[in-house]
């Protein structure tokens, strides 16, 4: 158990051993272990405990005198005090644990591996799927089913190594080397690849199978991706992790909750995030802690899992070098004090971080080229004949062995050194170091035989930690009940953190209930309310059933987090599932009572206590059952794209087979079974029986009736189905039996069946939650458009997780390639730049009088501590800010910047944002066509793109598809593309780059700097922020702008050869000397007191302002302004642009050129997204076929006409699913546009919004054809046109209405999402408006039956005209023939039935089936479909009017979408002041945090969206 998670803030005491001495003792112990065979686990743990006790006795705060859980406030053991020492705490905790006899024994877990081979199946490249070629995948599927497998890809080959308990292993290698796969293999996470059966892994006597099954949480893999619940605070997030792994017995007498809180506080203090305790974690869309802090939250959570074997995959990504060193220092302390084992893959490891590790593994394309002590690794390769350049770190030197572009060979060794991965591996296999390693592995395996004594002790320790109720073989610590309780607590915290969805859902349901109730207000207790009561109960049961539909989206959002916690063995996914169900119960209960209470009593449903409670109870049970239904769909599928189409068809089926839209007697025989598995059908029958059974309803309308029919008794009959001649009322039981086939005896039986459905679906949900995981990434393999690249099947290994190796093939670029970058002449300068933002009514200064310039042919680094405002300054200079107040002077050749400045500069953002479906060449071409000056011919722009591809060495993957992160281009290729997109625009002024090397390995970082160096040599002006680079990278910059906290300048000037000028400035002004081997970039942070643990008494900002260098900067700025202001030509080369007004426009391309290019790209995107198009097609075809064949050839009976009407009504349920498909797609498009393309002035917002609306129209046209054919003809609506010989015309008219319906749905989706941030909120808004449109369209209740207040809603509802048009086209001008149960029977007063009914028929219509009979007349009250149409206000004469009005709504949606987008999302310019007001810079804000703050303008936009 890792009792001491370690810390960033470890403050050693004067009598406490230093980290270095402790590390040396550890190495000494290792050497003894290697020389005297492998020490036993007990011996090693004994040594660790003895060392810890020795150090503890020397500590000022001895653990014998103080319990960490009862530490004195302000002491070194108090994590909430300012003097906290993580090392002192760890030793005190260990002593407390050792002194407690009831505490569980400590566990350690080393690992040996030999003959380790890992492989996968697939290709190094793949073809891009499109709407046209996806069918070719069927061929490959058939081959796979026939037993043919894809090509075997070797990922790791013949790996051997030994990492003992208490040791640290660093894994080095470029992307694609297999580092991620190796770490995953050690922890048993082998999804997507296979471990060879002959591979040997030994975890100190524990086998890999036992590790995965019984001890999963004892070996954890921490990926570089940060996934957390965004609306939970950091403190609660870490408390949960600590509580989930809390042992049964807590040493020191603390309770479990006290233990969890204490561990949380300790880990937060250790990693420097105590100040974020009450701040939500956030994510890319929800503002929370900064990116660096979120990374430390992820690290802290993993540490709290207390795993004895920890594998960290690039977990320092996003941290600067100082924090990366502290992270390694923390791991060092864990291993030495607690015996944990740490394996870390790290990029750009600083030398200080590398020195903390015991051993190093170097991988080269899956081959092991070295494994052994870190202190001997460098000499191993030097002995081969390689040279380590000055100031290159050991880690970078070892990694450079895997690149022929970077490794340097000693003179005379050119023909002796290895060159290929196989040659390096062969040299390793023949080495003395490998022979020693094999000997150590052999002794280790013999000492720790699998299934031996150590396994039993490991089990005993694990069992002592577990809850008593937990199974011995379970990997979890808490019992299942405890897991549920803990997850229930977190669910409550999540609900408190973000109650908006719950509140909005409850309010939405209450509003809908009020609206529906007002529509059916105070129904009469007579037969005139029969249809209305049925409609009301149908609507009520459907709303209750589908109120949980959005739970699918919630489950998919939390799925990655739950699966991560399951891998950490914190809890069963099913425990979280049960907790979420329990947490939803109060809301569902309250919602069921409030909504149904309003609906039940306002509408005058049966006002009896028993019936009311039965109605609420049935609705509540059905809500729970359908919640299980939606959760089951989400858990059984692996992605939302898979789930939505199936959910849509199932929702349609469940709705249709309730028994209301299609009565049981009208259900086709082949589909009647669907009603038996429809829980909604059972619920509807029960509440219909509950409402009608045992009641008598007075008759309102009799047949015959009128002035000539003053009759009674058996001579007239109530016109309602279920009536009896001569009876003045209709029994409710007769009505529901005749109309729906319902029986009162099935009322409670149906509730029991619904309960059974709930139990079955709940079981499916829980089992699937535990065993079905979400869809995994396929890996970063290149994807080409079919026909644009031949698959190369001869290449080497691929790292499933890490991607292909860097594709650079040439060390140098030809001078001809460099020459395509036109020489720049403009100089950009800035003076006294200040930037203020408003934070909680307080004006805060972020940048404080910053000066500088960037000249052509120079590479300037912008550096500073975290929170200094580096990215903020870059955004201000590049005119990317939309908030705050900017003051100062920013000039281009002595002149103010104009509207064209943004498009004339290139800005390569840190995030590599690109359209995933485009190829590299297309992305570059798009930028060139829209951002290069308009006067340049199109052919020249395209030719320029080809030259940029050559310059950036992207020829090999120029036609590859970008893909999404994790699939497609790897990190280096994406970074090259990001820079290429800016270069393709031919920036006339300069190039901004924000952290171009962040998260990259040293080789890739060097390659990026190579590229920047090429651009600089050809006259490109470059300003680049960079996170504390290595010494070799830092030397490549010409100038440095160095900021301290508060955005204040510390230094601006030349760097000098070997940083001599920079070093001289700081030493001359009181800084300590820079050691020869030190990294100047890290040294200068220590000098100004910005590095962890460093301090200075010198005010370096004040020193700069008083220095001669500052005076020179001011003088030179004035000189530049005076000289350059004489120049009037802002162009780089072409004099023809001197007086071209177009060169000063905001956008380079005219609007219609923008619109054409954007429209073309969006069309290509949809064509290359077959999942989107085919899911849309599947949704339309499946739903229409389902409806069509469920109502196959519906006859023109009274109920048949109702069925035909509901066939149209049911089709409208496509609406919600249709817009839910469009909205997420639009959100992804908008994110790219607003993050990269809008700030760079690539094209206007009008082109963006219009293109996204129009691109849906042709696909909707195709979908309308499919939907029409699969729906119109099966139902038999075409037969109604045969009487008037207008089959073709009526068919065409129906297709037009189907077409305009889909057009309306598409534009409505854009109308909803245009101003809102998330598809979920827009979906809620859309569903509410859709519900209102359906309620007021005239189907469920006619205009005559509506309260007069709602008549305006009937007239403004688009569906009113859609229903009127479709009903008239589908049903008009046809005869009606009643079914046997629909005829009304009565006796005539005298004469025949025909004579008796003649006057009534002339007045009301209908026909007599037996006109010549003199008794028992059979009368059908309707003989013409036009009579039915009049009841719903649908007339064929208004067909074209209704069609035209629908297009009015479509056009309105489109214009409303544009207007709302402009109103709520188009940014307004920040305030710019010539002179800055004197504001004290209080504290510092992380640049990430600053960018994430809400400005006054953004706040207004957010308020507009919220108000909307």
Swiss-Prot record:
It holds the Pfam family ABC2_membrane_7. It comes from the Eukaryota. It is a multi-pass membrane protein. One of its GO terms (molecular function) is ABC-type transporter activity. It is found in: Cell membrane. Residues 136-390, 828-1070 form the ABC transporter domain. InterPro entries: AAA+_ATPase (IPR003593), ABC2_TM (IPR013525), ABC_trans_N (IPR029481), ABC_transporter-like_ATP-bd (IPR003439), ABCG_dom (IPR043926), ABCG_PDR_1 (IPR034001), ABCG_PDR_2 (IPR034003), P-loop_NTPase (IPR027417). GO terms for cellular component: plasma membrane. Belongs to the ABC transporter superfamily. ABCG family. PDR (TC 3.A.1.205) subfamily. Its main location: membrane. ABC-type transporter; part of the gene cluster that mediates the biosynthesis of the sesterterpenes ophiobolins, fungal phytotoxins with potential anti-cancer activities. Acts as a specific transporter involved in ophiobolins secretion. Residues 11-24, 55-68 have a biased composition (Polar residues). Keywords: ATP-binding, Cell membrane, Glycoprotein, Membrane, Nucleotide-binding, Transmembrane, Transmembrane helix, Transport. This is ABC-type transporter oblD. PROSITE patterns: ABC_TRANSPORTER_2 (PS50893).
């Amino acid at each position: 158990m890792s009792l001491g998670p370690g810390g960033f803030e470890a403050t050693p005491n004067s009598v406490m051993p230093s980290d270095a001495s402790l590390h040396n003792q550890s190495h000494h112990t290792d050497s003894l272990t290697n020389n005297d065979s492998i020490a036993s686990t007990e011996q090693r743990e004994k040594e660790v405990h003895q060392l810890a006790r020795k150090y503890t006795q020397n500590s000022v705060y001895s653990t014998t005198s103080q319990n960490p859980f009862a530490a004195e406030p302000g002491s070194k053991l108090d994590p909430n005090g300012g003097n906290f020492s993580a090392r002192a705490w760890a030793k005190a905790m260990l002593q407390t644990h050792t002194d407690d006899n009831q505490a569980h024994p400590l566990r350690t877990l080393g690992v040996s591996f030999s003959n380790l081979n890992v492989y996968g199946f697939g290709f190094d490249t793949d073809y891009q799927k499109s709407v046209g070629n996806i069918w070719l995948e069927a061929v490959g599927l058939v081959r796979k089913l026939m037993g043919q497998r894809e090509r075997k890809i070797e990922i790791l080959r013949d790996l051997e190594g030994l990492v003992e308990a208490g040791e640290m292993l660093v894994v080095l290698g470029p992307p694609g080397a297999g580092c991620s796969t190796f770490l995953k293999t050690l922890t048993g996470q082998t999804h997507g690849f296979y471990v060879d059966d002959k591979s040997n892994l030994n975890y100190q006597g524990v086998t890999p199978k036992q590790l995965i099954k019984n001890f999963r949480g004892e070996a954890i893999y921490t990926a570089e991706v940060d996934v957390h619940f965004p609306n939970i605070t950091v403190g609660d997030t870490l408390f949960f992790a600590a509580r989930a792994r809390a042992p049964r017995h807590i040493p020191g007498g603390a309770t479990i909750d006290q233990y969890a809180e204490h561990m949380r506080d300790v880990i937060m203090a250790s990693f420097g995030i105590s100040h974020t305790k009450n701040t939500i974690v956030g994510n890319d869309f929800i503002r929370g802690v900064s990116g660096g802090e979120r990374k430390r939250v992820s690290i802290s959570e993993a540490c709290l899992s207390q795993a004895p074997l920890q594998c960290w995959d690039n977990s320092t990504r996003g941290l600067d070098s100082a924090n990366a060193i502290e992270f390694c220092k923390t791991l060092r302390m864990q291993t030495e004090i607690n015996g944990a084992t740490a394996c870390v893959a790290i990029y750009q490891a600083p030398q200080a971080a590398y020195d903390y590790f015991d051993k190093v593994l170097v991988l080269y394309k899956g081959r092991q080229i070295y494994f052994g002590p870190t202190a001997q690794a460098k000499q191993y390769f030097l002995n081969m004949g390689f040279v380590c350049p000055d100031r290159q770190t050991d880690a970078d030197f070892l990694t450079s062995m895997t690149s022929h572009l970077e490794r340097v060979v000693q003179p005379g060794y050119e023909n002796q050194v290895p060159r290929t991965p196989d040659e390096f591996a062969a040299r390793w296999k023949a080495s003395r170091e490998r022979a020693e390693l094999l000997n150590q592995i052999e002794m280790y395996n013999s000492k720790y035989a699998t299934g031996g004594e150590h396994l039993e002790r490991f089990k005993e320790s694990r069992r002592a930690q577990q809850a008593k109720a937990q199974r011995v073989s379970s990997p979890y610590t808490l019992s299942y009940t405890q897991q549920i309780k803990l997850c229930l607590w977190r669910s409550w915290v999540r609900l408190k953190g973000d109650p908006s969805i719950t509140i909005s859902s409850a309010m939405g349901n209450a509003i809908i209930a009020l609206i529906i109730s007002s529509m059916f207000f105070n129904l009469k207790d007579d037969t005139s309310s029969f249809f209305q009561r049925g409609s009301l109960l149908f609507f009520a049961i459907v709303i209750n059933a589908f109120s949980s539909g959005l739970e699918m989206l919630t489950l998919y959002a939390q799925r990655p987090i739950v699966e991560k916690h399951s891998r950490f063995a914190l809890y069963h996914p099913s425990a979280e599932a049960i907790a979420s169900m329990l947490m939803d119960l109060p809301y569902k209960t309250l919602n069921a009572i409030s909504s149904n209470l309003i609906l039940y009593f306002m509408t005058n449903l049966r006002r009896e206590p028993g019936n009311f409670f039965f109605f609420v109870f049935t609705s509540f049970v059905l809500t729970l059952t359908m919640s299980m239904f939606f959760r089951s769909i989400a858990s059984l599928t692996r992605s939302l794209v898979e789930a939505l189409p199936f959910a849509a068809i199932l929702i349609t089926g469940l709705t249709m087979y309730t028994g209301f839209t299609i009565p049981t007697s009208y259900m086709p025989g082949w589909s009647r079974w669907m009603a038996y598995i429809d829980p909604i059908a059972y619920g509807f029958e029960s509440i219909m029986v509950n409402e009608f059974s045992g009641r008598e309803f007075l008759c309102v309308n009799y047949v015959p009736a009128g002035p000539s029919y003053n009759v009674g008794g058996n001579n007239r009959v109530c016109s309602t189905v279920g009536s009896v001649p001569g009876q003045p009322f209709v029994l409710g039981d007769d009505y529901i039996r005749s109309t729906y086939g319902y029986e009162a005896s099935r009322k409670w039986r149906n509730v029991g069946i619904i309960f059974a459905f709930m139990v079955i679906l709940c079981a499916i949900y829980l089992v699937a939650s535990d065993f079905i995981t979400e869809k995994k990434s396929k890996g970063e393999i290149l994807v080409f458009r079919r026909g644009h690249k031949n698959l190369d099947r001869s290449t080497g290994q691929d790292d499933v997780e890490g991607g292909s190796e860097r594709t650079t093939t040439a060390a140098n670029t030809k001078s001809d390639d460099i020459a395509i970058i036109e020489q720049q002449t403009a100089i950009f300068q800035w003076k006294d730049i200040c930037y203020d933002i408003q934070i909680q009514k307080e004006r805060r200064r972020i940048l404080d009088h910053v000066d500088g310039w960037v000249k052509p042919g120079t590479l300037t680094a912008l550096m500073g501590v975290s929170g200094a405002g580096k990215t903020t300054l870059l955004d201000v200079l590049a005119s990317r800010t939309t908030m705050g107040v900017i003051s100062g002077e920013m000039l281009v050749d002595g002149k103010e910047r104009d509207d064209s400045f943004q498009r004339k500069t290139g800005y390569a953002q840190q995030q590599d944002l690109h359209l995933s479906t485009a190829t590299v060449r297309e992305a570059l071409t798009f930028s060139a066509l829209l951002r290069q000056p308009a006067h340049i011919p199109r052919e020249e722009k395209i030719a320029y793109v080809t030259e940029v591809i050559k310059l950036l060495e992207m020829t090999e993957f120029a036609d590859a598809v970008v893909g999404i992160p994790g699939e497609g281009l790897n990190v280096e290729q994406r970074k090259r593309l990001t820079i290429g997109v800016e270069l393709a625009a031919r920036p006339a002024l300069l190039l901004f780059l924000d952290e171009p090397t962040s998260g990259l390995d040293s080789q890739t970082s060097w390659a990026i700097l190579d590229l920047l160096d090429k651009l600089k040599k050809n006259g490109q002006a470059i300003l680049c922020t960079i996170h504390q680079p290595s010494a070799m990278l830092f030397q490549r910059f010409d100038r440095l702008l160095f900021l301290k906290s508060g955005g204040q300048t510390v230094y601006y000037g030349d760097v000098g050869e070997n940083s001599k000028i920079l070093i001289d400035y700081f030493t001359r002004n009181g800084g300590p000397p820079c050691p020869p081997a030190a990294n100047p970039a890290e040294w200068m942070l220590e000098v100004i007191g910005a590095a962890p643990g460093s301090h200075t008494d010198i005010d370096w900002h004040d020193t700069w302002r008083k220095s001669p260098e500052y005076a020179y900067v001011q003088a030179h700025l004035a000189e530049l302004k005076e000289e350059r202001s004489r120049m009037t030509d802002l162009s780089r080369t072409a004099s023809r642009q001197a007086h071209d007004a177009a060169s000063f426009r905001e956008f380079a391309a005219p609007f219609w050129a923008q619109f054409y290019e954007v429209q073309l790209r969006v069309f290509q995107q949809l064509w290359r997204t077959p999942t989107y198009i085919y899911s849309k097609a599947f949704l339309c075809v499946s739903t229409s076929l389902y409806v069509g064949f469920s109502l196959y050839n519906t006859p023109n009976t009274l109920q048949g006409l109702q069925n035909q009407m509901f066939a149209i009504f049911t089709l409208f349920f496509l609406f919600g699913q249709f817009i839910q498909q469009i909205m997420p797609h639009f959100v992804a498009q908008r994110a790219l546009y607003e993050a990269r393309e809008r700030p760079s002035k690539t094209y206007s917002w009008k082109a963006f919004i219009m293109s996204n609306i129009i691109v849906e129209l042709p696909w909707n046209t195709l979908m309308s054809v499919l939907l029409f054919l699969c729906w119109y003809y099966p139902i038999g609506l075409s037969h109604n046109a045969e009487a008037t010989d207008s089959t073709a015309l009526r068919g065409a008219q129906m297709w037009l209405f189907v077409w305009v319906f889909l057009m309306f749905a598409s534009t409505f989706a854009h109308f909803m999402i245009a101003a809102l941030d998330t598809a979920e909120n827009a979906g809620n808004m859309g569903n509410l408006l859709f519900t209102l449109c359906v309620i007021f369209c005239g189907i469920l209740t006619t205009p005559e039956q509506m309260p007069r207040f709602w008549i305006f809603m009937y007239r403004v509802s688009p569906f009113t005209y859609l229903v009127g048009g479709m009903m008239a086209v589908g049903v008009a001008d046809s005869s009606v023939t009643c079914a046997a149960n629909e005829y009304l029977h009565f006796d005539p007063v005298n004469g025949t039935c025909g004579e008796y009914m003649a006057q009534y028929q002339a007045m009301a219509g209908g026909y007599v089936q037996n006109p010549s009979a003199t008794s028992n007349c059979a009368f059908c009250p309707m003989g013409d479909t036009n009579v039915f149409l009049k009841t719903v206000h649908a007339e064929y004469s208004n067909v074209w009017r209704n069609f035209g009005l629908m297009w009015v709504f479509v056009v309105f949606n489109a214009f409303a979408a544009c207007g709302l987008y402009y109103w709520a999302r188009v940014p307004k310019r920040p305030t710019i002041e010539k002179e800055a007001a004197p504001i004290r810079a209080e504290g510092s804000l992380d640049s990430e945090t600053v960018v994430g703050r809400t400005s006054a303008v953004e706040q207004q936009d957010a308020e507009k969206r919220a108000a909307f």
